[in-house]
Amino acid sequence: MDPSMANNPELLQFLAQEKERAMVNEMVSKMTSVCWDKCITSAPGSKFSSSESSCLTHCAQRYMDMSMIIMKRFNSQ
């Protein structure tokens, strides 16, 4: 990178936003994989069953809760 660009506030903001976007995409991908493997135990039909839907909802919520706890813990250190 050109050294003069390293102090460009717009570029730094853009890079920070892209890094955050990549982290969110990675988290969603991981959550989808984990919850799918946990909750969808047979070949899915055209709709999720009520138990699959409930499991996916709870799994995603627990995953998000744990992610927030971990982020808070890292930020406090």
From Swiss-Prot:
Gene3D superfamilies: Mitochondrial import inner membrane translocase subunit tim13 like domains. InterPro entries: Tim10-like, Tim10-like_dom_sf. The modification N-acetylmethionine is found at M1. One of its GO terms (molecular function) is metal ion binding. It comes from the Eukaryota. It is found in: Mitochondrion intermembrane space. A motif (Twin CX3C motif) lies at residues 35-59. Belongs to the small Tim family. This is Mitochondrial import inner membrane translocase subunit TIM8. It comes from Arabidopsis thaliana.
